[in-house]
Amino acid sequence: DAVKNANKLFMESGCDCIKLEGGSDVAPVIKAIVKAGIPVCAHIGLTPQSAAMMGGFKVQGKSLEAAQELLDSARAVEEAGAFMVVLEGIPKMLADVITQKINIPTMGIGAGAGCDMQVLVAQDMLGMNEWVPKFAKKFADLHKIIIDAYNEFAKESNERTFPDEATQYKDRKSVV
């Protein structure tokens, strides 16, 4: 089913790859999907779609045993054929070690600057919400801009200054 569903998603969506959350546990699935000719990006550490089962959005790989599991998972997804791996919500030192020990690129989100590349959620980076995760940086404050825009819209609507002449259709004299 995984290969069939991945193929359908890949063919019908126009995406460039399939991203699978999980490490050693999903390596056989990654291998099968890659064998079918579909590129796979793996995602280990804090995996958002299963965060509830991990006790919420918490840093992963803090104990020696958990760190070793993540390193083993990175190696397993690489061996299974993943072309890259997202490292999310793990200590910087662990992300550095994983990046050095595997031969596929790492993409970090809350994993320190040592990964091969970085990614952030647009809403966090653009400040679209009041709260942002510890690892994210607000590069803009769109939350304030959005709230101000809604308040201005409500004000002008209530005052009946919007819509105005420039933003409404003109009546034809023959119709009125």
Across the structure, where does each feature detected by a protein language model lie?
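Alpha/beta enzyme core
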Residues: 1-133, 137-140, 144-172
